[in-house]
Amino acid sequence: MLKKINLKNKTALVTGAGKGLGKACAIALAEAGAKVIILSRTKSDLIKVNKIIKKTKGSSQLFVCDVTNLDDLKKVLRKISRLDILVNNAGNNRPQHFTQVSQENMEYLTNLNMKAAFNVAQLCSQKMVKANNRKKIGGSIIH
């Protein structure tokens, strides 16, 4: 998918990497040469994605992480020395008619789709600007 792009010596983190778009992004980034750090709540999904990446001769590291848990997220990010690319993909939807949405569902979706997305972006961007040997300050964030 990204074979014309060279991401050698780049490190990418993908949240929600166990399925769907996150899985596809993780595999594509690995095919382009990036070292990919994959996060998901579901270990079995991460293991499957990790195997696919390894078959393509890509490099990946997996972490089971609930991004709505700030302590879990910080613990994972402490283990990462460099970060160049973030695919902030973790998210969910619980389709319901607006008049039927419970407080519990609203809080769950707000925590995952807004608060967690903010926390992931903020903490990862802090890591990006602190990276050694960076020619310019920053990195790439995809939401």
Regions found by a protein language model. Give the residues of each.
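Substrate-binding pocket helix/loop in short-chain dehydrogenase/reductase
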Residues: 97-98, 105-110
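Conserved NAD(P)H cofactor-binding loop of Rossmann-fold oxidoreductase domains
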Residues: 89-94
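Flexible N-terminal pre-Rossmann segment of NAD(P)-dependent oxidoreductases
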Residues: 1-10, 133-134
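Conserved glycine-rich Rossmann-like NAD(P)H-binding loop of the short-chain dehydrogenase/reductase
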Residues: 34-48
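The beta1-alpha1 cofactor-binding region of Rossmann-like NAD(H)/NADP(H)-dependent oxidoreductases
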Residues: 44, 63-75, 103
